[in-house]
Each structure stands twice: as structure tokens, then as C-alpha cells.
């Protein structure tokens, strides 16, 4: 907890999934790089990935009750007011204990109570804490839409996400904050080490496959189903199938390996080992894959409101990847479309260059500077 008011105190709220947590932690790192005396505290829930990711990155984590916002009318709507009150109450305790100067929200289960708790409360008995909102997705969620109405600054990855500050037609477009270990990655320099780490051959094309932190059955089935074709074409595979899934791919005698793992904890090495990737198109995934300049086959999650396809469109429009519908991804597609790409170094190089050009490598630092500026303006008026 922060009792020294000469020290900047920042609350980052973005728990639940890696897509909310990683941008928050990237901004936290960037704030510390600018002001190493700053205290950054993360809000999260007991059931989110933040219980692992936040401590690993060295930041204090304060848990609050989650507030899932149903997209459609369900019985959960009846429970929502009570959940919100409990979560806001707990969040206010954290804001007071840390002496928070600014709240930075990235959407997710903890963002809404953070936005509400930062307000002055009934009869304006509390100090108002300024809010900065960052929307990573191409279509904003409910929490960030509510937060944007109260925010000092509203930032977004792409135009037209549906959030903006008062008096503006759109958010400030900065891209998605990505950790420095990814934006500064030199894939070619790490290639030999990365391939040795995973037991992949030093030469020849490598296909990276992952479906998010929990894997993706359709990606698993399509790529493993093309294992013989991939091996025959001399393509090695690094495939993260998800901790709840299994993948048994017989080794091809004399052929390149098909390395199947539940989870990839060293994404920097995975990206460095690969020549192309098949993956979902969550906002954070698209940001990282484009930042490192990897050609990608994006397979949007076939649920929700089509946000994942929207996330991938800018990179695809720039020529850095392609989109294939989940239902169209098959072993045949891998054999007929992905293998020829992996066997074409010139096309891989061109797509990689275009992907890198579509990314925003400085987003974390830019967001951090805005957060510090917003906090300074408020601190100066106290």
C-alpha cells in the first residue's frame, strides 16, 4: 500500500483474460520505465489469469468480486446490482488504501467497478480519481463504454471501436500496449536458440499454432490432421494445444518434428522459432503477432459479435496475414494454402514486413505518458 503522496500511485484494471491483463501489465512496465518510484497496483479477481500473471511480473494484486456483464437478458441480470455494489465497495477500499492518483481501465470483469469506484459517490463525499480508458478490441465492451463517459482520456487500438471521450467523435488511436520483450524482439538473432529450446530443426520452415491460453479444438484438429502433409513438405510444427486438450501426432520417420505442448510460457522464443502462425485473432494476439512481424493465418473465434474478425482486418488489409473462418479451417486448407506459403520465402518476407508495418510498437510508452500526465494534472490541483 502507498502512504507516500509524493509517489505516483496507479491502479490498472484489466483482469479476467490475457487479452485484458497483458496490455495492463505492458503499461505498468512502461510507467515504471518512465518513473521507477511509481507504485502500480493491479485489480483482479480470484478466478482470472491475473492471479498468476501479475505476481510473475512483480506487481501487487488486489482481488475484488468479479462483475460479469451478460450480453443478453438472462437471470444473471437480476444478480447484477448486488454484485456491482459489493465489487465497488471493495474497489473503493483499494483506491483509498493505495492513495490512487489515476485509474487505468482495459475492460474485463474488474474494469466496471474500478470506473464506478473512482467517482465521487453519493453527495460527492469522496475525491474523484481521474480515469484513463483503453479499448483493445475493434468493438468495445459494456464496461469500457460506461468508463468512457467518465474518463479524462479515452484511447483505443483502432478507429470506430465505439468509445470516445466527451466532445470527441472517436477515441485517440494508439494501438495496443505490448510488453517490451515482444516489441523489442529480434527474431533472427534468437532463431537458433529458440529452435534448439523447442527441439526444432535449425533449418527449414516452422509453423507455429496456438489458440489462446486454453487452446482451440478446431485449430488442433485441422493442423494435426495435416501432419503427414506438413512432414512430407519438410515443415516442422510447434503446436500449443491447450492444457485441457491432448494431441497425439505420430512422428514421421525421418521427417521434421511435430512438437505438441499444452502451453507456451516463452512466447518470445515461440515467435522467434516460427516462420508463420495459425492462431485466433484476439486483440492481444493480433498485436503481438504483427509487432514481431510474423505472417499469420487468423481464425476468428466463431462466437460473440464478430470482434475477432474485426481485430484482424487492419493487418490483413495491410497484407500481413489472411483470415479464414473457423468452419473453413481444415486439414485440406492447411495442405493447399498454408504449406505453399511456408515454402515461399519471398512471400513470407513480404508478409512479415507488412505485418510489422501495421503494428504499434510504441503504444505502451504512449499510454504510460498519458496516464502520468493525467495523474499530474489532478495531483497539481489538490
From Swiss-Prot:
Function description: Cell wall formation. Catalyzes the transfer of a GlcNAc subunit on undecaprenyl-pyrophosphoryl-MurNAc-pentapeptide (lipid intermediate I) to form undecaprenyl-pyrophosphoryl-MurNAc-(pentapeptide)GlcNAc (lipid intermediate II).
One Gene Ontology biological process: regulation of cell shape
HAMAP family: MurG (MF_00033)
Protein name per UniProt: UDP-N-acetylglucosamine--N-acetylmuramyl-(pentapeptide) pyrophosphoryl-undecaprenol N-acetylglucosamine transferase
A GO CC term attached to the entry: plasma membrane
GO molecular function, one term: undecaprenyldiphospho-muramoylpentapeptide beta-N-acetylglucosaminyltransferase activity
Chain positions recorded as UDP-N-acetyl-alpha-D-glucosamine binding sites: 17-19, 137, 179, 213, 308
Keyword Transferase belongs to the record: yes
E.C. number(s) listed in UniProt: 2.4.1.227
Keyword Cell division attributed: yes
Record-annotated disulphide pairs: none
Organism listed in the record: Rhodococcus opacus (strain B4)
Top-level division of the source organism's lineage: Bacteria
Amino acid at each position: 500500500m502507498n502512504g507516500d503522496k509524493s509517489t505516483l500511485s496507479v491502479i490498472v484494471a484489466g483482469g479476467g483474460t490475457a487479452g485484458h491483463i497483458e496490455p495492463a501489465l505492458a503499461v505498468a512496465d512502461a510507467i515504471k520505465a518512465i518513473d521507477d518510484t511509481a507504485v502500480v497496483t493491479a485489480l483482479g479477481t480470484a478466478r482470472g489469469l491475473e492471479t498468476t500473471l501479475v505476481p510473475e511480473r512483480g506487481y501487487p494484486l488486489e482481488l475484488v468480486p468479479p462483475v460479469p456483464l451478460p450480453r443478453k437478458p438472462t437471470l444473471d441480470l437480476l444478480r447484477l446490482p448486488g454484485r456491482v455494489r459489493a465489487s465497488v465497495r471493495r474497489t473503493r477500499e483499494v483506491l483509498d488504501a493505495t492513495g490512487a492518483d489515476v485509474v487505468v481501465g482495459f475492460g474485463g470483469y474488474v474494469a466496471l467497478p474500478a470506473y464506478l469506484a473512482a467517482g465521487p459517490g453519493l453527495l460527492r463525499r469522496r475525491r474523484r480519481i481521474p480515469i484513463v480508458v483503453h479499448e483493445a478490441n475493434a468493438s468495445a465492451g459494456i464496461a469500457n463504454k460506461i468508463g468512457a463517459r467518465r474518463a479524462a482520456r479515452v484511447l483505443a487500438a483502432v478507429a470506430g471501436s465505439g468509445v470516445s471521450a466527451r466532445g470527441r467523435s472517436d477515441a485517440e488511436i494508439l494501438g495496443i500496449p505490448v510488453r517490451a520483450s515482444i516489441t523489442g524482439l529480434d527474431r533472427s538473432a534468437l532463431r537458433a536458440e529458440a529452435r534448439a529450446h523447442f527441439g526444432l530443426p535449425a533449418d527449414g520452415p516452422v509453423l507455429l499454432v496456438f489458440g489462446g491460453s486454453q487452446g482451440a479444438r478446431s485449430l488442433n484438429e485441422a493442423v494435426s490432421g495435416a501432419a503427414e502433409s506438413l512432414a512430407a513438405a519438410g515443415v516442422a510444427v510447434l503446436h500449443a494445444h491447450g492444457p485441457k486438450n491432448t494431441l497425439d501426432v505420430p512422428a514421421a520417420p525421418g521427417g521434421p518434428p511435430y512438437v505438441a505442448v499444452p502451453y507456451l510460457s516463452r512466447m518470445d522464443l515461440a515467435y522467434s522459432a516460427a516462420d508463420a502462425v495459425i492462431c485466433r485473432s484476439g486483440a492481444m494476439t493480433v498485436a503481438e503477432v504483427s509487432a514481431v512481424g510474423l505472417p499469420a493465418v487468423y481464425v476468428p473465434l466463431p462466437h460473440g459479435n464478430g470482434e475477432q474478425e474485426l481485430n484482424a482486418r487492419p493487418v490483413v488489409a495491410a497484407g500481413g496475414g489472411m483470415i479464414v473462418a473457423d468452419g473453413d479451417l481444415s486439414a485440406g486448407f492447411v495442405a493447399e494454402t498454408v504449406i505453399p506459403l511456408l515454402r515461399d520465402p519471398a512471400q513470407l518476407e513480404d508478409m512479415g514486413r507488412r505485418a510489422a508495418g501495421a503494428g504499434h510498437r510504441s503504444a505502451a510508452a504512449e499510454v504510460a505518458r498519458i496516464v502520468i500526465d493525467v495523474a499530474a494534472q489532478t495531483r497539481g490541483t489538490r
